[in-house]
Amino acid sequence: MIKDMIDSIEQFAQTQADFPVYDCLGERRTYGQLKRDSDSIAALIDSLALLAKSPVLVFGAQTYDMLATFVALTKSGHAYIPVDVHSAPERILAIIEIAKPSLIIAIEEFPLTIEGISLVSLSEIESAKLAEMPYERTHSVKGDDNYYIIFTSGTTGQPKGVQISHDNLLSFTNWMIEDAAFDVPKQPQMLAQPPYSFDLSVMYWAPTLALGGTLFALPKELVADFKQLFTTIAQLPVGIWTSTPSFADMAMLSDDFCQAKMPALTHFYFDGEELTVSTARKLFERFPSAKIINAYGPTEATVALSAIEITREMVDNYTRLPIGYPKPDSPTYIIDEDGKELSSGEQGEIIVTGPAVSKGYLNNPEKTAEAFFTFKGQPAYHTGDIGSLTEDNILLYGGRLDFQIKYAGYRIELEDVSQQLNQSPMVASAVAVPRYNKEHKVQNLLAYIVVKDGVKERFDRELELTKAIKASVKDHMMSYMMPSKFLYRDSLPLTPNGKIDIKTLINEVNNR
């Protein structure tokens, strides 16, 4: 168990100063360098005399200087707001307007001119590092102080800043490094793929820094080159893979993504979206000896609140894979529309309680009051997810409340339809979306389909392919759930965080 993130990093700077903490295609930085660089950057930040505990926006990609700046800000007593280099200018402006940061640190060239907020450039960070300024920690982030603030997409289009405290982070990190499901080794060698602006990134950097491991990052230029990206990943000595399931699906398009070519890769950690039976089955075929961990949780409950090791037996017997045993310190409940706790097996909304629950959304008391509350004397959060608990306290996922539609008198989970279609042996990926009429009622269901390699060539017309897919799933899919139209694509759009972008597809079919 660790009691302070920075104390842990500082300890490794003493005991394994020359061990790499960061590796980008062979360009390495050690724990000793991270201490010296973060001390120097923290001294620079202190010299600016910012308002105590005020948040600082950090703009950049998956670089070492981002990591060193995050550590420096924690030492200096400031929460950091990670903003990815690929963010749209409108989103950056919205984040600045809401967060009111006292400073912007631009590790990459900042695309906007902001009046009234000082900006520190990469050249100033580099100069501070060269100066090697000593630093005495007297006011670092502690306890309920905000450690980081990650902005998620709001339903109104306005992003919401989720405040995660040092205590929240410790609750998550200690669970992850101690829980048998994750089985994190000492000095873990982790792939650092999800951007820092996505809280899934915490699942790789927090346990790695807590256990003295190495982060293997990829340069941003590589991420846009699909073929080169996965050729490079296959050559990395990573032992643990952390990503959304969608990113793993992309990786499996490369023949090099297999146990024979990547023998060091033994653990897969998934979070951020639902892990399908189809993806898990394919992964077991590629990596027969690997451990596949399915984790679940919203950003508001610090990355994940439950986890479970997926077995071949689960893949063979479940239509939707379980999402885990809740964390011991985070009692999780299922409630009905009136807020009453439901019994085992009953489906309702998943709520999470305990020390990993955020204090709320930054400078947004209205949205905070809607989502955060007290349950059984504990801080609690409405996940907006449908689920149930088995008698063995395993959490089962049933979809999103906001992706639940009423069609032809039936209440339908869009994700349930997608899961059923994904069971077809011809389908690589499927997403169900509703088309609305002028009265905003569901007119019909459509499905976006990516078929497996070689499937299209077996059919003369798409109509015949559609009939074949429908026939392949009709035995386990209710007729009223079957989409009336299938739209075939070579790929499905992903959000910057690597999830399938369902909202974009819904907007597309409704001409929004």
Swiss-Prot record:
Superkingdom, taxonomy of origin: Bacteria
Reactions it catalyzes: holo-[D-alanyl-carrier protein] + D-alanine + ATP = D-alanyl-[D-alanyl-carrier protein] + AMP + diphosphate
Annotated localization: Cytoplasm
Protein family (similarity comment): Belongs to the ATP-dependent AMP-binding enzyme family. DltA subfamily.
A Pfam family recorded for this sequence: AMP-binding
EC number, as in UniProt: 6.2.1.54
Function, in words: Catalyzes the first step in the D-alanylation of lipoteichoic acid (LTA), the activation of D-alanine and its transfer onto the D-alanyl carrier protein (Dcp) DltC. In an ATP-dependent two-step reaction, forms a high energy D-alanyl-AMP intermediate, followed by transfer of the D-alanyl residue as a thiol ester to the phosphopantheinyl prosthetic group of the Dcp. D-alanylation of LTA plays an important role in modulating the properties of the cell wall in Gram-positive bacteria, influencing the net charge of the cell wall.
PROSITE patterns in the record: AMP_BINDING
The entry's keywords: ATP-binding, Cytoplasm, Ligase, Nucleotide-binding
Pathway: Cell wall biogenesis; lipoteichoic acid biosynthesis
Taxonomic lineage of the native organism: Bacteria, Bacillati, Bacillota, Bacilli, Lactobacillales
Protein name, UniProt field: D-alanine--D-alanyl carrier protein ligase
Gene Ontology MF, one: ATP binding
GO CC terms, sorted: cytoplasm
Gene symbol of the encoding locus: dltA
InterPro entries per UniProt: AA_adenyl_dom, AMP-bd_C, AMP-bd_C_sf, AMP-binding_CS, AMP-dep_synth/lig_dom, ANL_N_sf, DltA, DltA-like
Main localization, broad class: cytoplasm
Listed GO biological process terms: lipoteichoic acid biosynthetic process
Binding site for ATP: 152-153, 294-299, 385, 397-400, 499
Residues annotated for D-alanine binding in this entry: 199, 303, 499
